[in-house]
Amino acid sequence: GRKKGVQFDEGAPDDFDPNNPYKKDVAFL
């Protein structure tokens, strides 16, 4: 939630995939 949002505000995470930005969220689900 909020912490991840702050991460995106500061810059994409190291494992951020521009082709599938929600891959990490889906993995948690």
UniProtKB/Swiss-Prot annotation:
Protein name in UniProt: NADH dehydrogenase [ubiquinone] 1 beta subcomplex subunit 10
Main location, first listed in the record: mitochondrion
Family: Belongs to the complex I NDUFB10 subunit family.
Keywords, alphabetical: Electron transport, Membrane, Mitochondrion, Mitochondrion inner membrane, Respiratory chain, Transport
Quaternary organization: Complex I is composed of about 45 different subunits.
Functional note: Accessory subunit of the mitochondrial membrane respiratory chain NADH dehydrogenase (Complex I), that is believed not to be involved in catalysis. Complex I functions in the transfer of electrons from NADH to the respiratory chain. The immediate electron acceptor for the enzyme is believed to be ubiquinone.
Organism: Solanum tuberosum
UniProt topology in membrane: Peripheral membrane protein
GO CC terms, sorted: mitochondrial inner membrane
Residue segments, region Disordered: 1-29
Compartments, record wording: Mitochondrion inner membrane
